[in-house]
From Swiss-Prot:
The chain crosses the membrane at residues 13-33. PANTHER family: POTASSIUM-TRANSPORTING ATPASE C CHAIN, POTASSIUM-TRANSPORTING ATPASE KDPC SUBUNIT. This is Potassium-transporting ATPase KdpC subunit. The keyword GTP-binding does not apply. Pfam families: KdpC (PF02669). Part of the high-affinity ATP-driven potassium transport (or Kdp) system, which catalyzes the hydrolysis of ATP coupled with the electrogenic transport of potassium into the cytoplasm. This subunit acts as a catalytic chaperone that increases the ATP-binding affinity of the ATP-hydrolyzing subunit KdpB by the formation of a transient KdpB/KdpC/ATP ternary complex. Its main location: membrane. One of its GO terms (cellular component) is plasma membrane.
Length: 201
């Protein structure tokens, strides 16, 4: 008991000091630095034009009309979780279906059929895999350059645009490899679609 009484005050003081340092000072310091150096990224990388917010470059938005670039398959569940007021909350995750299952095979085939139906001019071309599969998060905002180029003719036709103009937009919103060597080039779907709509210049 005596040992406890001797150690406890010291432990409590250390606990309080580190709580203030790590939970307070460090948090305030990092938040301040991020707001100073990376204000856009620190606030969610929101795309805002003329005071209107269109979304984040880090989160996918669903596009499935003929005029826009399609992204990866999104798995959004709005039936599982609700808040304290009963409002449905969006939840995203992979399907967890086995790649070897018949159910997954049928699901992918359905997606393949939809892609082919909307891109008849690409009948002989292999469909990029990211157009018929979802990412681990189900909210991936990027697609491969191949997946974007696969859709160019459809987008140009339905927007009365030149193919070259669509290509230029895709090139503008294509990110290179990390440090020039890691990963692959990717295209941000939301930015491309906002540019097609004339919102981003």
């Amino acid at each position: 008991m005596k040992e406890f009484k001797a150690v406890f005050p010291k432990a409590l003081i250390i606990f309080i000091i580190f709580t203030i340092l790590c939970g307070g000072i460090y948090t305030i310091f990092i938040t301040g630095i991020s707001q100073l150096i990376f204000p856009k990224q620190a606030n969610g990388s929101i795309i805002e034009v003329n005071g209107k917010k269109y979304g984040s470059v880090l989160l996918a938005q669903q596009y499935n009309d003929e005029k826009h670039l399609w992204g990866r398959i999104m798995n959004i569940d709005t039936n599982t979780f609700v808040d304290e007021n009963g409002k449905k909350l969006a939840y995203s995750a992979p399907s967890n279906l086995s790649p070897a299952s018949k159910e997954y095979e049928a699901l992918v085939q359905e997606r393949v059929d939809k892609i082919k139906e909307n891109h008849p001019e690409q009948d002989e071309q292999a469909i990029p895999v990211d157009l018929v599969t979802c990412s681990g998060s189900g909210l991936d905002p990027h697609i491969s350059v191949a997946a974007a180029k696969y859709q160019i003719n459809r987008i140009a036709k339905n927007n009365n645009m030149e193919v070259k103009d669509v290509e230029n937009i895709i090139d503008k919103y294509t990110s290179g490899k990390l440090f020039g060597v890691l990963g692959e080039k990717t295209v941000n779907v939301l930015e491309v679609n906002l540019a097609i709509d004339g919102i981003l210049k």
